[in-house]
Amino acid sequence: MLDGVSIAWKDLFDIEGRITTAGSVVLKSNPPAKNDAALVDAGKRAGMVAIAALSMNEFAYSGIGINPHYGTPRNPHDKKLHRSPGGSSSGSAVAVACGSLPVAIGTDTGGSIRLPAAFNGIVGYKSSTGHYDMSGVFPLSRTLDSLGPLAQTVEDCVMVGRVLRGLNTSITKRDIKGMEFIVPTNIMFDGIEDAVQENFEAALKRITKAGVRIKRKTFPVFEKFFELLKTRGNVLGPEALQLHWNRVHGPDAERMDPRVVKRIKMAENMSAVDFVEVLLQRQALIAECNDEIKTAIVICPTTPHVAMDIKPLEDDMDLFFATNAKTLRNTMIGNFFDWCGLAIPSGTNEDDMPTSVLLSAPHGQDTKVLSSGLSLESIIRQNANL
């Protein structure tokens, strides 16, 4: 079915005979991989042609896409400004958006598939954790890491995802009239750009007209999540710090992106008690959130703004961190609550920069999200010109 189809992999996936750099110069002297990552091997066995390892943020630790070592891919939707390609699967999204590849595979720990897809006007699917075999993939957070395809259409994501999992069964469209969606009314729309809001509301009207039942609902559990972040910390930080401890406390730190070093070291302020408390409270909050969602799908803007000019972010570290946090806000909610998610283009703003809609559901409901996306993609993308 996919024999001869080109595919490329974010530079976290081991490709036999090639050094996996994870976007960092500090790994350039590592020995080449002796074996393919599990998914790379699955793609090859299906006849897919692995043609490249793709650019990314150093160690996958940002939603902006900046890489001072190997260069930051240009967002193809602006020929003048060097806008953010999104991160951390920046090269994966740009390669697909430019038409260089039909599909690329990325990873997502806080939004790193869905954000680049949104900024570049393509489809990005973040699977549930454990949905794909992670063997041979350089980690960031063993609790939160997940994988998924970036492609031009939902159908392409479904097709490639099925092959990489070695499945014979297919995912088909859901009956639109049986769908129930929830729009969160808190957190996710704070500071949203006008065009993102307008395109989102227009997409809601179209899918409502098609038969989807829409309910708007406040999620107090979101407020609890952000309060937990403020008072205790997050899951990702300590896991990244443990992984990179020797790098950020040794000579390698001077060769790393200072933004990445600073972000990793932020977790030093968390105690072991804080980390355990976050893990325990996370499970309770996931259960509470799932009870709020029940059988519905959560729909929201993938990110509150379109891709931004990267120059000010390169020059001002404080601005970089503030922008990164806002960019990741909506998607990282999904990672914390262990959702799967599908980003679909919803239109453009006055500068022809893409906006995006995100469909999400609790862990293990990947088929529901993808089948809903198959049914609704053409309606959501109507007049998107992407």
Segments the model singles out, each with a brief description of its role:
Residues R45, C98-D190, E201-A210, V276, ...:
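Structural helix-boundary/capping segments
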Residues L243-F336:
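Serine-dependent amide/ester hydrolase catalytic core
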Residues T20-S29, E193-D194, M308-D316:
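Glycine/threonine-rich flexible loop motifs
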Residues M1-T109, K205, A210-G211, N290:
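Gly/Ser-rich catalytic/binding loops embedded in alpha/beta enzyme cores
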Residues A8, L27-P31, D145-Q152, K265-M270, ...:
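Short, well-ordered beta-strand elements within core beta-sheets of diverse protein domains
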Residues L12, I187, T303-V306:
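Short glycine-rich anion-binding loops that position phosphate/pyrophosphate groups of nucleotides
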Residues G178-I187, K217-R232, D257-N269:
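Flexible, acidic loop-helix segments that line cofactor/substrate-binding pockets
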Residues L2-V25, H82, I176-G178, N234-I286, ...:
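Short helix-loop capping/hinge segments that flank enzyme active sites or metal/cofactor-binding pockets
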